From Swiss-Prot:
The keyword Cell membrane does not apply. GO terms for molecular function: acyl-CoA dehydrogenase activity; flavin adenine dinucleotide binding; monooxygenase activity. CDD domains: NcnH (cd01159). Its EC number is 1.14.14.27. It catalyses: resorcinol + FADH2 + O2 = benzene-1,2,4-triol + FAD + H2O + H(+). Coiled coil: none annotated. Keywords: FAD, Flavoprotein, Monooxygenase, Oxidoreductase. Belongs to the HpaH/HsaA monooxygenase family. Gene3D superfamilies: Acyl-CoA dehydrogenase/oxidase, N-terminal domain, Butyryl-CoA Dehydrogenase, subunit A, domain 2, Butyryl-CoA Dehydrogenase, subunit A, domain 3. Induction: Induced in the presence of gamma-resorcylate. This is FADH(2)-dependent resorcinol hydroxylase, oxygenase component. It is an enzyme of class 1 (oxidoreductase).
């Protein structure tokens, strides 16, 4: 396309209020309604509107289409704080915002298809390429079901992963295909114990045509060498490999859930007096050494998780910019380091919520208790294949031992 309104824009020079500070101003809304979000099994429209009002979905959206083109680490840091208030809202909002960055990897024409019609459009996604796309004149056709489409009821488009048929003597290639919400139905399949409010339902497509310009292959996305990256050739943000970014947002929800659990636990235990006969009545919980140790362990775990996650995503964006300037290259080892940090930060988060939840007593079983909710939500994050340490850790070990790493990086 030749529309100069889409030309890459220079960075803004006006004073910048960091996104994490803007989240702090609205966090109480999400915290006070976390149980209602869980019970409704979706993030309410009022939450999306509040986040839109503070520019949450613009932070890593390209300036050429009205976004801020900011730092990915800034989104991850803000999403930790948002998830501390409500993990379901953080999971959905983090993905919806990060998908603005992912859309920027597509050809400019695809970006215009989405944002020219609706500058506020948001995208959900279903990442497992379990269906085969059928070749058609000028594109592909999709039919079938795409599960785990988090935030699908809050989105106007979806990124549906599928296998493209091989070209000539080539091999089948996994890819994302952009589909508008008007061309799929949503099947209610999300009835779960953790992250219940993420509306991660199933998309149903029936012979949907997707033009070729709305396709982004996995090899391009995971390497960081994408059509959109070439369009934004001077912006390191849009040349980061896919899996240095998206899983960092997923991990931030687990880290944030643990951070929120710690704050709630300290607030509750600080004024709690025991009633039980075993522990002895009328004793302050805060004076028990075991409680003190659990608080210390959780705090150290949360701090370590934050440090690892934020360090690695900042390193990834800096390295991408250095690659554009010819000063460095983004190697497989660099991509694996990002995957290691993302997953291990969630492992630390699980350690934190386990230490806290194990000592909440009978009152901790109540569904209104934020610690038990954070424990369930953080464990749900840890079940995601991108965060599962058994899957990611073995991949890292394979590489360190001279073997080919088996997994997504």
């Amino acid at each position: 396309m030749n529309d100069m309104s889409h030309a890459p824009q220079p960075a803004q020079t006006k004073p910048h209020v960091r996104l994490v500070g803007r989240v702090a101003g609205v966090a109480d809304l999400f915290r006070s309604s976390a149980r209602q979000t869980e019970e409704a099994r979706r993030v309410p429209a009022s939450h999306i509107a509040a986040l839109r009002g503070i520019g949450y979905f613009d932070i890593v959206k390209p300036r050429a289409f009205g976004g801020q083109g900011g730092e990915f680490a800034e989104l991850v840091e803000a999403n930790i704080e948002l998830s501390a208030a409500c993990a379901s809202t953080g999971w959905v909002a983090g993905l919806l915002s990060a998908h603005q960055w992912l859309l920027a990897m597509f050809p400019e024409e695809a970006q215009a298809d989405v944002w020219d019609e609706n500058p506020d459009a948001l995208l959900c996604g279903s990442y497992a390429p379990v269906k085969m796309a059928e070749a058609a004149d000028g594109g592909y056709r999709l039919s079938g079901k795409w599960a785990f489409a988090s935030g699908c009821e809050n989105a106007q488009w979806s990124l549906c992963a599928a296998i493209l048929p091989p070209q000539a003597k080539g091999r089948p290639v996994p890819a994302f295909l952009l589909v508008p919400a008007s061309q799929y139905a949503i099947e209610d399949t999300w009835h779960v114990v953790g992250l219940a409010g993420t509306v991660s339902k199933t998309l149903v497509l029936d012979d949907v045509f997707v033009p070729k310009h709305r396709v982004l292959t996995f090899p391009d996305a995971t390497s960081g060498h994408t059509p959109g990256g070439r369009f934004y050739a001077q912006e390191g943000l849009f040349n980061m490999p896919l899996l240095t970014g998206i899983p960092s947002c997923l991990a931030s929800t687990g880290v944030g859930a643990a951070k929120g659990a710690l704050a709630a636990y300290v607030d509750h235990v600080g004024g709690r007096v025991t009633r039980g006969a075993v522990a002895g009545g009328n004793n302050r919980m805060a004076e028990f050494p075991t409680i003190q140790l659990r608080v210390a362990e959780a705090a150290a775990s949360v701090d370590a998780a934050c440090e690892i996650l934020l360090r690695d995503v900042a390193r990834a964006q800096a390295l991408s910019q250095a690659r554009l300037e010819g000063r460095a290259e983004f190697s497989v080892d660099d991509r694996l380091l990002s995957r290691r940090g993302q997953s291990f930060s969630v492992s630390f988060s699980l350690r934190a919520v386990q230490a806290l939840n194990d000592s909440t007593g009978g009152v901790g079983l109540d569904l209104s208790n934020p610690v038990q909710r954070a424990w369930r939500d953080a464990n749900a994050v840890g079940r995601h294949i991108s965060m599962n340490w058994d899957a990611v850790g073995t991949m890292i070990g394979q590489s360190m031992l001279g073997l080919e790493p088996k997994g997504q990086y």
